[in-house]
A protein has these predicted regions:
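Short cysteine-rich clusters marking metal-coordination/redox-active sites
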Residues: 9-12, 29-32
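Cys/His-rich microdomains that often coordinate metals
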Residues: 16, 36, 76
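Non-catalytic, surface beta->alpha helical segment in thiol-disulfide oxidoreductase systems
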Residues: 111, 116-150
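Short Cys/His-rich micro-motifs in 6-15 aa windows
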Residues: 32-41
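Thiol-based oxidoreductase modules, predominantly thioredoxin-like and allied folds used
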Residues: 64, 75, 79-83, 87-102, ...
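Short linker/helix segments within small regulatory modules
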Residues: 18-27
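Short pre-active-site segment immediately N-terminal to redox-active cysteine/selenocysteine motifs
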Residues: 57, 64-68, 111
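A short beta-strand-turn-helix
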Residues: 41-60
């Protein structure tokens, strides 16, 4: 892992350079001075999606969901708890496909919920269907580790 990481602020979407050893719960954005780590998933829209996927040095796990989807609503608390467990190693984010159908179309989302793991803009893996917190954590760690071994 790089000694300096790029980490996108979940509030103002400014890219911050942070020493890997300093990426803790107390790291703040250099622009808006709010915490970089939220302990929960961040909401992405069409404007913030690319910036968060392309500029993060860390993997980003995106939950493509919709408010009318029962399994999506059922999985939401598990996804939020998984975010608290996986941060700062994997950033968790959510995209409302009803509000942002262009993102669902661009990434060929055919069923929801669908989890897609990205690293520096490249899709590493995807899973369709609701998962428990432990399954989300296990799956994302396994896919992230598999991708890092393939890259080395």
């Amino acid at each position: 892992m790089a000694s300096t990481l790029h980490f996108v602020c979940p509030h103002c979407h400014t890219t911050n350079r942070i020493a890997a050893e300093n990426l803790t719960g107390s790291a703040d954005c250099g622009q808006c001075h709010r915490p970089l780590l939220t302990g929960g998933p961040i909401e992405l829209d069409a404007n913030s999606f690319e910036r968060n996927l392309m500029r993060h040095h860390l993997p980003v796990l995106v939950d493509f969901w919709a408010p009318w989807c029962g399994p999506c609503r059922q999985m939401a608390p598990a996804f939020a708890r998984a975010a608290a467990e996986l941060e700062p190693h994997i950033r968790l984010a959510k995209v409302d496909t009803q509000s942002h159908p262009e993102l669902a179309s661009r990434y060929a989302i055919r069923a929801i919920p669908t989890l897609v793991l990205f690293h520096q803009g490249r899709e590493l893996a995807r899973h369709s269907g609701a998962m428990s917190q432990s399954d989300i954590v296990r799956w994302s760690q396994m896919q992230s580790t598999r991708a890092s071994h393939a890259a080395s």
